[in-house]
Amino acid sequence: MRFTRHAALATAALLAAACADRTTPTGPSAIAAPNAIYGGDPTGASQFASVGALLYDFDANGVIDGNDEDCTGSLISPTVFLTAAHCVDFFPANAQLYVSFAPDLYARGIKTIAATGFTYDPGYGHDNADLHDMAVIFLPAKATKGMATYKLPVAGYLDALSAKGALSKATFYNVGYGTGHTATGVPGYPYDGVRKESVSQFSALEPDWLQLLMNTSATGTGGDCYGDSGGPKFLTSDPTTVVATVTTGDYVCRATTKDYRLDTPTARAFLGQFVALP
């Protein structure tokens, strides 16, 4: 789910127009509920270091920091940053996007990388059965020198695990820069620009979706919320392979998260244009 300015995350506004408070540029998403890590811990500089924030100078002040976070994503090659289509489809083609892998977007003097371009799956927004919710941000060749890149899954990876009964008790890492949320009472969404990780339990596997539980009260674990869209999902048994990316969830971030699978023919057809597939 895409980020909305945290100061505007009052419950009424959230339910009425989850992603509509950005004004420069405008970009209501077709799937619209935004998403962020909650029930988690800061990753620090070394853990999940190749998970980054997608940024745009929304306030046009020339300073790129936590106020400019749009979504989360992950580095899948030295020059390719993977995120969600609904994070970028509203931008003009010449929009200057940025990526930062800083663990705290409000830290002084964070490094930001000016993207050289971006594109998203042309099927996005045209197929309600399969959202094609993928985008890639292109980075300069030497900008990520020395950084590790994440792997993509083999074809049918999650199906194979399901067939073996290996998913029912599986847990997954959520990693992102999004907001937290209050577990009970009136919804609240604190945001601090810090990259965090949490763990969620498996819920269901669909042809294009991985669903995870994020009911903290019931499971004692965490989830994601506003600002985590495009962020990676890893099996806790393999934190190097991005098996899905965040697309959406319930508006108050207390039930389930719905994540777009990367092991399907649709995902592989798009991503295979930009990176070598396993």
Predicted regions and their residues:
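A conserved glycine-rich beta-strand in the N-terminal activation segment of trypsin-fold
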Residues: 51-53, 59-78
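Solvent-exposed loop/turn segments at secondary-structure junctions
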Residues: 80-81, 87-89, 125, 142-145, ...
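Bacterial N-terminal signal peptides that target proteins for export
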Residues: 1-8
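C-terminal subregion of chymotrypsin/trypsin-like serine protease catalytic domains
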Residues: 20-36, 44, 70-89, 95-101, ...
